[in-house]
Amino acid sequence: MEEKLSRRRRVVLVPVPAQGHITPMIQLAKALHSKGFSITVVQTKFNYLNPSNDLSDFQFVTIPENLPVSDLKNLGPGRFLIKLANECYVSFKDLLGQLLVNEEEEIACVIYDEFMYFVEVAVKEFKLRNVILSTTSATAFVCRFVMCELYAKDGLAQLKEGGEREVELVPELYPIRYKDLPSSVFASVESSVELFKNTCYKGTASSVIINTVRCLEMSSLEWLQQELEIPVYSIGPLHMVVSAPPTSLLEENESCIEWLNKQKPSSVIYISLGSFTLMETKEMLEMAYGFVSSNQHFLWVIRPGSICGSEISEEELLKKMVITDRGYIVKWAPQKQVLAHSAVGAFWSHCGWNSTLESLGEGVPLICRPFTTDQKGNARYLECVWKVGIQVEGELERGAIERAVKRLMVDEEGEEMKRRALSLKEKLKASVLAQGSSHKSLDDFIKTL
């Protein structure tokens, strides 16, 4: 028995090949590695992460799939993930079989991103323990469930029709409106629901890990626990649970830290819309005018390829944008370092879940401009539940942008949000310390292995 336990040490992890999913999966891997487990990370050729030297203790293996990069653009993320699942199932099963034959260590469990749902079917054939990792919020998980249930009852008319009806509240999901449900700008409601049916299916999963904190989402976690009828572990924020090396798919420009060093405390608004958001040229120019008119210092991340519908190059567009010496623009930034910097007083964000947790973890209030899917619900919670955010809705217009920036950076309302954000920061810090809820959840999960 002792020999069997000592060999049951390897954990296999399967992330979605996207920045917002890879990062928390690697953070979880680091947490498990710190507890004595060996780690194997299964990647696709698409968006392959070139591991840093800090991850040299991890084994990285690749599923041989043949999806062209153009598929993501042509199909949209939802349909692309469905195609990826169909493409990877057989090769993943073969790879898993090889791991079982070749490895000296037994596999304790396979942890897969909920959107890599094909893993559950493959793992089941080998009778291995499998665990779902949700890299979105618990509330987003609930919303996906509810969308599937409403769709089955033809109850998503408000979302399909748009207009005034989409601002109606979803029954029993206050303060979520129909427009806040995690539908995608890249896909129809029907396509989104098709994907969510797969992600919400627990199959033979023994448990679910969610990158969240009980103090933020207690009611959603309790809802999921009752609905799924398997243990739900809130182990987050994962970036605070353990120190992990950068896993950025884009090169980070650290010159912005030197620029921040020259600014006054809480005087800079950091602007970043994530690794996937697309913007029209007109929107980008309106943002530039709004930020400059606010008379606030700003650090702005403009990702290559993020401006669509432009007849001129991004370099030419940047020249057209009247940026004063109060502004600093980079293509990509070391976000956790930026948010932790004393000069940063606010974050204009797309409200992806990682960005949301990183901002709350540093006590930085947000201006919320969600783009798609779960970002909309996150923004709603930031504004209406946690009260540390201001949502900018509708068409982007320079006056509205200027007013939002001043509300957060100048007005008393912003000071109150900052105080609430700092209070949440302390609660999140406490959750990952010994006796904290997330620390206990991680220990409880490890005991099951």
Curated annotation (Swiss-Prot):
Keywords attached to this entry: Glycosyltransferase, Transferase
Any Pfam family the entry gives: UDPGT
Keyword flag Transferase: yes
Binding residues annotated for UDP-alpha-D-glucose, in chain numbering: 275, 333-335, 350-358, 372-375
Enzyme class: transferase
Superkingdom as given in the UniProt entry: Eukaryota
Enzyme nomenclature, EC number: 2.4.1.-
Recorded GO MF terms: UDP-glycosyltransferase activity
Family of this protein: Belongs to the UDP-glycosyltransferase family.
The protein's name: UDP-glycosyltransferase 76E7
